[in-house]
């Protein structure tokens, strides 16, 4: 965080800073750390030695630009070179060469990586910090059982338990445990050393029986006992070196490597002074942990809160990428060892370049970015989504939790989250509470701790010093919560203020306060901070709003919100969608494609984004805002991006809304809208779809892209150019050909049609031996072709086919079935589009644009929408914009209501419209029915809230099935739009049909129109030619499946068919 010149004031940190700092930490420290771990490699005869010279490494600037990497499906990466030496020990000769280790993907200005043409982002993970933790649980008798859990750097756990006889056990597996004396002896301590290093030797001696003495009589005996319990081996195993190696690999390496963070935590918790470089568990640690456990048993010491953030660590992008580099270097080491041995066996002279290949590093990073759960495709629905995605914190992933096993306690909000993790912004569903979002001012400190800033209040000096505190440290201070000084230093402090101390809330005198918060948004994430009047909303609805703002579609014409929070500008600046001047200068040329700047004798070319597709098919576009000949300064905005206007985030529109029921069309959150929103393109958005086809070389020859496609109607090919590819600017409809392609196939003489054989025999005409495999426009894809990319085969690549991509732009107006939402969790589906003359209208004659259901407010307790609605109306009339900080009630009671009513009153005075503020029912107004002209019985709340159009659009969801695939087992239609699936008649549908008594329809739906294989084909035929549908003569497939399942349970079930004519029983086999 930066400090301003004003004392006690600060600026908001960059929202992408977390990602940048992590990647820079990897480049500065992590890269060299892993290279220094790479060992010197010798052959088996120790004649040759291979080593890397770490100081000589270099990263080369990428050869391609980011935009080209996206279009050509390449990785935006840097080539990694380092010097390596091969030393012959007999002659002391050394051969040194610069070798190519591989490609390391780089981070771009958005804080993301481009891998195979896809924007990917690595999110941060929260893990249990390595160290020791003491807990108490009740057994089945209601007696407290104390345990100490040692967590290793790799996530392995070693549990120490104390029973009611004060005997201490180490649990080596789920079912087996050994005495603490056996464990200490196996780690190298004898009995005398054990008794000298513990605080309670008499307790250790109390459970030292003769049998126990024999087990710890020597280190070998202790290891044998340990191995017997660990591996559950019976009999009398014999001590050997292989037995020790197995224990080392399977137990000690997984459960006893603490790492630097674990060593620091262990020293602090057990008050030890072991060196930080000693990162393995020692006998001294085990004995000190046992002493503490005995103390817990007798009521001394404090238990640990496993969910406290001081006991967690953040695994950032730096840690994850560094781990992958270490993994790649281990693979490279094994490969070099094998290659050296092979070369010497065949009496070849190796060189560093022959020994090293780039495959381990390149493939490791590609698999990491492509397959790792914490590497995700960047969500680019709108600018806000891009920022928020990189600030996520996940408990899931390797070494973490799973959505099905995580307890409620882990998902819950903890007091230590204050100012570090947003208490509101989390995902809905099974992962609720497991995927959080960083608070605005939080940062990742040394050792992976989450730090939050505070102002230190000093009685000596009037100045406020800002400091970052890790989760455990702020508990020892009195922290003032929600004090006005956080916004205005000139305000006189109250005598008594609410404060936080050791996870409790107190009321104390101002003189006792040590720290105060620095900003009113300090506790929230970016998404939650963009909700005005958030303090008047239920937290569940604020959570929904935080998520839904990320689903808002950029509109064709953006509009600033009348009521905001003040963070809109910062969010737009950090999102990367704005073009910002990096140098001052003069604009010498500008168009929709680029801006040319002249300054300091150089000409700078700034390319603009034109109709670029995001991975959610939304349109990313930049509009230049500077004119030729104008002088600009560094940091000035040159072009606005998608969903931004005036340098601020603009996700929706300010529309006139009435809260009232209307003929049942807004029942259950449905929304009634005016046709003005359609005809004036208020909620029109552009979407870009990508369609691609590849040409392969088959066994019969290469596939051809051509315009000459036989047996296809001419109108389907009318948009193709001479090469067989659709022309730019063409309007294409469903079913039309985008790319013409023929695939060769082997055709036997006998498979020709008779007329084809006749043509060949008489005229010698060669009939086509190719089948058409053209790229056709699927259903719902109509639009304008805006770009075509033909990506040729890479040089020297035999496997990479040619790819042709066609980009089609769609213009979508708002329609029935689309989803809209406000910023307070108030969401709904468009149910009807009314003519504007039928909409309710105000006293000045203006028809409203939307009608919301008023019953959606009281039960959901999101009253903030009412404040925003009324203040938006006042702002629209006064031509003002408001930026409201949250929790304004701390200044005075009813501050929000007073502000809204005063602005409404001022608007009614200045615009001479007394109906805007009527004292009898302030905030409400009498409005009229557009169909009859009569006033409605009750006054209605009207206003101008900010309403978003979400990406859940009916064009993407509507689906019908005429024919398609069936499931192999049940012979019923598949599920889902992507599989061309259909609806099935389930038990609830059967109940509905039974309720209406429609026996024949029920029979059809359950038999020959459903899963009766032969009968459903006959139904199709009789429907086409007309006639009676024949009755099936055997059982449907679902009944046969039931019979088979019962047979698998050893229940024989036969079914019989009774003929209508003879009434004779005919037995049918299932």
Swiss-Prot record:
One Gene Ontology MF term: ribonucleoside binding
GO cellular component, one term: DNA-directed RNA polymerase complex
Pfam families for the chain: RNA_pol_Rpb2_2 (PF04561), RNA_pol_Rpb2_3 (PF04565), RNA_pol_Rpb2_6 (PF00562), RNA_pol_Rpb2_7 (PF04560)
Keyword Oxidoreductase: no
Catalysed transformations (reactions): RNA(n) + a ribonucleoside 5'-triphosphate = RNA(n+1) + diphosphate
GO aspect biological process, one term: DNA-templated transcription
Keywords: Chloroplast, DNA-directed RNA polymerase, Nucleotidyltransferase, Plastid, Transcription, Transferase
Enzyme class label: transferase
EC number of the protein: 2.7.7.6
Similarity-based family: Belongs to the RNA polymerase beta chain family.
HAMAP family reported in the protein's UniProt record: RNApol_bact_RpoB
Function text: DNA-dependent RNA polymerase catalyzes the transcription of DNA into RNA using the four ribonucleoside triphosphates as substrates.
Protein name: DNA-directed RNA polymerase subunit beta
Species of the source: Daucus carota
